[in-house]
């Protein structure tokens, strides 16, 4: 299991292609042709400037592509983090808008799949959807998931959050087949609700769980790694958790610590600096998934409990 970070320059993307469709890639594509496949997870500190964030994402995409990754995962709010109330709703766009157009072009020009967690998708004049978008290496949108569990929390230390005041929750659990296995899509606060991950694993047959996030510094220090490792262990899936990191503005700071975790709960990818911008790269080993699930067949041993 290899993991490392790299740093390179990027080239500017050009044209745009978009199509929304259900995945047509068979699950056996990745598991029978190649027993291992490389993935990357990005860490960044997004700000309230769409083009600045796109430049950072473009550079990280090129790093991942040159490292041989077939998929790179970005954190929640990759394209924008506002520093004033209402900013995120103001800049929200539909999936066929210019922001997503740029990222579709980037995926196609770089020949790599993108997991874009926490895109501000326009719902109406006062609300958005926190949408996880998966784009293939042809620049096509393969599927989307809208965050179901919204962050309405009083964080120890005085900060309060009310995501539901401007975000419409999703209602559908989503998985999508890809060259790196069957992906289970979630976003950030979903991590605290195991049932969605259980459904992705046991009902939708996910092999890799994606958790793009922007954990607060306080909650991240207390719970980030242990929650991620728990989700990996209880589902016997790889977990890729791309994280926002550091100070976005005077009011907001994210924990960072982007991680890739294997089905046994072992951290196999981690940046050396918890809050630095960069990527971590690791190999998804399908033989390990098979081995863990065969030796401990929890999918066959689960008992239905009605309370």
Swiss-Prot record:
InterPro entries: C-N_Hydrolase (IPR003010), C-N_Hydrolase_sf (IPR036526), Nit1/2_C-N_Hydrolase (IPR045254). It catalyses: N-(4-oxoglutaryl)-L-cysteinylglycine + H2O = L-cysteinylglycine + 2-oxoglutarate; N-(4-carboxy-4-oxobutanoyl)-L-ethylglycylglycine + H2O = N-(2-aminobutanoyl)glycine + 2-oxoglutarate. Pfam families: CN_hydrolase. Residues 1-36 form a transit peptide. GO terms for biological process: metabolite repair. Disruption phenotype: No visible phenotype under normal growth conditions, but the accumuluation of N-(4-oxoglutarate)-L-cysteinylglycine (deaminated glutathione) in mutant plants is up to 70-fold higher than in the wild type. It is an enzyme of class 3 (hydrolase). GO terms for cellular component: chloroplast; cytoplasm; plastid. GO terms for molecular function: [acetyl-CoA carboxylase]-phosphatase activity; deaminated glutathione amidase activity. The active site is at 76 (proton acceptor), 147 (proton donor), 188 (nucleophile). Residues 37-286 form the CN hydrolase domain. It comes from the Eukaryota. Signal peptide: none annotated. Its EC number is 3.5.1.128. The keyword Lipoprotein does not apply. Keywords: Chloroplast, Cytoplasm, Hydrolase, Plastid, Transit peptide. Belongs to the nitrilase superfamily. NIT1/NIT2 family. Catalyzes the hydrolysis of the amide bond in N-(4-oxoglutarate)-L-cysteinylglycine (deaminated glutathione), a metabolite repair reaction to dispose of the harmful deaminated glutathione. Possesses amidase activity toward deaminated ophthalmate in vitro. This is Deaminated glutathione amidase, chloroplastic/cytosolic. It comes from Arabidopsis thaliana.
């Amino acid at each position: 299991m290899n993991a490392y970070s790299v740093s390179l320059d990027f080239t500017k993307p050009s044209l745009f292609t978009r199509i929304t469709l259900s995945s047509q890639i068979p699950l056996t594509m990745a598991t029978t042709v190649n027993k291992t496949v490389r993935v990357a997870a990005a860490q960044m500190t997004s700000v309230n400037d769409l083009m600045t964030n796109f430049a950072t994402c473009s550079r990280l995409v090129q790093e991942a592509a040159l490292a041989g990754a077939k998929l790179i995962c970005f954190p929640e709010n990759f394209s924008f983090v506002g520093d004033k109330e209402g900013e995120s709703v103001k800049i929200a766009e539909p999936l066929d808008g210019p922001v997503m157009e740029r990222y579709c072009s980037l995926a196609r020009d770089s020949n790599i799949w993108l997991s874009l967690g926490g895109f501000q998708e326009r719902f109406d004049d006062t609300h958005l959807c926190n949408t996880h978008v998966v784009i293939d290496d042809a620049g096509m949108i393969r599927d989307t998931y809208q965050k179901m569990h919204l962050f309405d929390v009083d964080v120890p230390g005085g900060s309060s959050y009310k995501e539901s005041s401007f975000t419409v929750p999703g209602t559908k659990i989503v998985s999508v087949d890809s060259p790196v296995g069957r992906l289970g899509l979630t976003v950030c606060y979903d991590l605290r609700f195991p049932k969605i991950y259980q459904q992705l694993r046991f009902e939708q047959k996910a092999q890799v769980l994606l958790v793009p996030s922007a954990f607060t510094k306080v909650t991240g220090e207390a719970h980030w790694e242990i929650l991620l490792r728990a989700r990996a262990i209880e589902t016997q899936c790889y977990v890729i958790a791309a994280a926002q990191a550091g100070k976005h503005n005077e009011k907001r700071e994210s924990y960072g610590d982007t991680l890739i975790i294997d089905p046994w709960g072992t951290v196999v990818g981690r940046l050396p600096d918890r809050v630095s911008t960069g990527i971590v790269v690791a190999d998804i080993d399908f033989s390990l998934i098979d081995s863990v699930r065969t030796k401990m067949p929890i999918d066959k041993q689960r008992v239905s409990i009605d309370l």
